[in-house]
Design a protein with these regions (language model features):
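Glycine-rich flexible loops
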Residues: 1-124
C-alpha cells in the first residue's frame, strides 16, 4: 500500500489539532511488507503537505520518492522501527501541551487525541 496520502492527511490533522506548531514535529509509517518508510519532509508546514511531498525511504535509508527533504529525525524513527517490530508508525510532535507539561511537571488532560489506525483505515 502507498502510505503517502494517508500520512499527508494525518499530518494535516496534527496541525489542525495543534499537536504540532510551525515547522516542528514529524511523522512516519513503515510498510513492513515492502520495507519502505514514509516520512514527512523537513521544514514544511504539515497543513500544506500533499501526497507528493511525503518522502519515501527504502530499507537502505535512501530517499526514493517525495518532493521534500526527509525529516532530520528520520534516523530516530528508524531506530524505533528496528527496536520494536510491532510498531508501524511514529509521531514526534513537539506538542505545545507536552512542552508545557515538561516545563511545569503538572498533570493535564490532552484535549485531542487522534488515532493513526482510524486515519489509515479510511484509506484502505
Amino acid at each position: 500500500m502507498d502510505y503517502a496520502q494517508p500520512l499527508a492527511f494525518f499530518a494535516h490533522i496534527l496541525e489542525q489539532k495543534r499537536l504540532v506548531t510551525a515547522l516542528e514535529g514529524n511523522a512516519s509509517v513503515i510498510d513492513r511488507q515492502t520495507g519502505l518508510t514514509y516520512v514527512t519532509p523537513s521544514g514544511r508546514m504539515k497543513l500544506l503537505l500533499e501526497k507528493e511531498d511525503i518522502c519515501v525511504m527504502n530499507a537502505a535509508g535512501e530517499q526514493i520518492g517525495g518532493r521534500g527533504r526527509r525529516s532530520s529525525e528520520y534516523l530516530l524513527h528508524e531506530a524505533v522501527y528496528q527496536a520494536r517490530p510491532d510498531v508501524t508508525a511514529v509521531v514526534h510532535s513537539h506538542c505545545p501541551f507536552l512542552t508545557a507539561y515538561a516545563l511545569r511537571y503538572q498533570n493535564f488532560d490532552v484535549p485531542e487525541t487522534c488515532s493513526l489506525r482510524e486515519v489509515f483505515t479510511h484509506f484502505t
